[in-house]
Amino acid sequence: MKSRTDQLDFDFSRPIDFQRNICSEIIDDCISELFKEDKNSLFNKHLKILILELYYCWIESDMQFLTVSMSKRGYNSKSRYNPNNISSYLIKVVKLLVKNNLINFHAGFYDHRTKKSRLTRIKSSKMLINQFEKIKLPSTQNINHRKKEYLLLYNKGKLCEYKDSYDTQEIRVILENYNKIVSKTLFDVPNLKRNILVRGDNKKIIISPFSSVFYKKEIEKIDKGLIGGCWWNKIDLHLFLNIKKKLTINNQKTSYIDLTKYFASYLSMISNSNVSIQQRSFSGVLDYDQLCYLIMKGFRSQTSKSFLNSVYKERKKFSLQSFTLSEIREAINNHIMANQKLQNFLYKGKDIGWNFVVSKIFFKLVSEITKIKVPVFLVRDKIYFPTDRESIILEKLEKIIFYELNLNNFKLHAEKASDFNFEKKGFFGRLVKSDIDFSQRYLDNKKLFGLE
């Protein structure tokens, strides 16, 4: 039997989201029950954001922690990323909840093993959970502040403040409209029983109904950025290969476009040469997704030795855990090292920017279709969409890819994602398997998103 300490996973945590909608009435009864005395408005605001986030965190997983700074330096109440103006006053509220036995508190410390400071972890106590269990979450909409920032600008890796421009304002409006669509859309794996996925590096991912999509950019490289923020953006190759044919949008037939088919075209464009990568791998070790990501890892590596050692060490992330080092080395030699056109890229210690291009293509697609409210999702370098909107998605994407990758005379072809049975029912093709084939977790999420 493991000790209580062994069972706690402090890495399974997320920071408090200061951009929640504290005007929500979801937890008002809970707060009234726990705090009978009237407090000042400053206290009430900080109490509400903390209880609200503890509630959302518990809904996501009762094993998940919230990280919170117990230092005044951890707060900037004037930040554009803090529309509720949450200050270090939150520390006082945290201490009060600890005193009243409403949260479990694990103080932050300096980790000598990783040489990093770890923030304090908190989690709802049984007393607080008893109150949460009385709450019925009405929907996943309107949980965020109306001025929530979806464009995140960084300066040398640190989130920074910035003055608005026409470009940033345009990006923000597109992201706001897209996130309204995301908040109303169920994107899920119907037969998955638990809402926790485990990556190849053992990091846990929660299939959260409260996802928000961000566009992260470096302020000095504003033309480049990465789409992220949601559970599906955190999936590694190991997980993706297991669920790519099961991802489903709104309980309907779902398809996807695989952008890795144009990875060689991208390499050709940036190298001004003709790079070819065999899409149908005859390797008993590597499929095409694995091959492309190993190629990119080879580009980022400094030497062939460090590349091979890193691949073998991280082989589970690439879904290669069942193969020996010699088998992996042979596959790499046959399908990467033997490709002469790749030699100009290998072992340069550089990222060639493929993920930036994928995010740019996706963002341009989003900007084209938000007005017609078609839900689309970027999962690694695959774009998922409802099958019944395939023609409009392909039309838009062909124009975007033509412009971004300088491709001529090509035709996009979508692949079917969901491996569940469907039949045509009215205008939409909906899942018709018996509910017994779907997890209770998924059926509950259907109700939450109004898909009964």
Task: Show where each model-derived region lies.
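Conserved catalytic core of nucleic-acid polymerases
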Residues: 1-44, 54-57, 111, 283-376
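Short helix->loop/beta-hairpin flanking segments within DNA-binding domains
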Residues: 31-81
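Helical catalytic core of nucleic-acid polymerases
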Residues: 67-86, 231-347
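Short, hydrophobic-biased segments on the C-terminal half of alpha helices
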Residues: 91-95, 366
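A short, conserved structural fragment
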Residues: 94-112, 375-376
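Acidic, glycine-rich two-metal-ion catalytic cores of nucleic acid-processing enzymes
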Residues: 121-290, 380-382
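C-terminal polymerase-core module
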Residues: 302-307, 390-452
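Amphipathic alpha-helical/coiled-coil segments positioned at domain termini
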Residues: 377-388
